[in-house]
């Protein structure tokens, strides 16, 4: 992460969805984010302590994705997320300038408030 980049971690945490459904939402959003020029990186979040005996090259945490953008493109990304994630239960973490903000949203209104809080946080 460079000095002028902002890291977003998005967790799909709808209790009505099983792990596979959360994973489908992550895959769909990753695919959409990869098509946006302003996004520097996007991907799954690696499990820091995969289960013993896991043969995969590092497992992923279910329902989580991470994306990075530069400061100038953060507002565009948040607008995109607002359009795509309205009405979904998520937790959004924003990391910038060595500080971290985490907000939860369960509706479009809460998501808009969360995005506004994230924008204010980045601007501070």
Please provide the spans of the model-predicted regions.
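Short amphipathic alpha-helical segments that predominantly mediate membrane engagement
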Residues: 1-62, 80-124
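Compact, glycine-rich, soluble single-domain proteins
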Residues: 58-67, 71-75
């Amino acid at each position: 992460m460079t000095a002028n980049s902002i890291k977003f971690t998005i967790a799909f945490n709808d209790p009505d969805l099983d792990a596979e459904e959360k994973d489908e939402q992550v895959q769909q959003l990753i695919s959409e984010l990869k098509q946006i020029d302003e996004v520097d990186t996007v991907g799954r979040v690696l499990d820091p302590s995969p289960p013993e005996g896991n043969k995969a090259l590092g497992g992923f945490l279910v329902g989580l994705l991470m994306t990075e953008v530069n400061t100038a493109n953060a507002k565009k990304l948040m607008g995109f997320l607002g359009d795509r994630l309205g009405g979904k239960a998520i937790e959004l973490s924003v990391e910038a300038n060595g500080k971290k903000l985490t907000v939860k949203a369960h509706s479009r209104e809460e998501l808009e408030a969360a995005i506004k809080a994230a924008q204010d946080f980045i601007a501070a």
